[in-house]
From Swiss-Prot:
Sequence repeats lie at residues 155-161, 162-169, 170-177. SUPFAM superfamilies: Hepatitis B viral capsid (hbcag). This is Capsid protein. GO terms for molecular function: DNA binding; RNA binding; structural molecule activity. It comes from Hepatitis B virus genotype C subtype ayw (isolate Australia/AustRC/1992).
Length: 183
């Protein structure tokens, strides 16, 4: 079976493959981030979102892989074979789990549409010959505001004032979104 864990989220393994392996933070940092930002929702018996569910599954899979690595370390007699198995788990399986964790944490943090826009932007940037592309890759947290998903029913803010209207001298106040619910 060819199962793509990103398909239902509008992405694909191929789309994430444009990001180099050293782009993704280490597992410990990703797990700490997930815990710091989404612990309550991840531990809740309530269903919050498909991203929360996928994040839970990735965390559980990593735990099981660590159990396997520990078992192999304890039970495989040959040190060279033991090292090969542990290395394979850390490098190959670890990368897949790091990609999954990064994707779902990013979708929960920035919004799915923003993350997909970032993946497409990065894919275009990396495939553009060096002579023709900007020196710096796109950065997820600095994507233009136009990629931010807005709630339905609200019209988007105007980007520039009309020529007849003068801009106020006082800074605009932004509405702060309440973080009452973690979901």
């Amino acid at each position: 079976m060819d199962i793509d864990p990103y398909k239902e989220f509008g992405a694909s393994v191929e789309l994430l493959s444009f990001l180099p392996s050293d782009f993704f933070p280490n597992i410990r940092d990703l797990l700490d981030t997930a815990s710091a930002l989404y612990r309550e929702a991840l531990e809740s018996p309530e269903h919050c979102s498909p991203h929360h569910t996928a994040l839970r599954q990735a965390i559980l899979c990593w735990g099981e892989l660590m159990n396997l690595a520990t078992w192999v370390g304890s039970n495989l007699e040959d040190p060279a074979s033991r090292e090969l198995v542990v290395s394979y788990v850390n490098v190959n399986m670890g990368l897949k789990i790091r990609q999954l964790l990064w994707f779902h944490i990013s979708c929960l943090t920035f919004g799915r549409e923003t993350v997909l826009e970032y993946l497409v932007s990065f894919g275009v940037w990396i495939r553009t010959p060096i002579a023709y592309r900007p020196p710096n890759a796109p950065i997820l947290s600095t994507l233009p505001e136009t990629t931010v998903v807005r709630r339905r029913g609200r019209s988007p803010r105007r980007r520039t004032p009309s020529p007849r209207r003068r801009r106020s001298q006082s800074p605009r106040r932004r509405r702060s979104q309440s973080r009452e619910s973690q979901c």
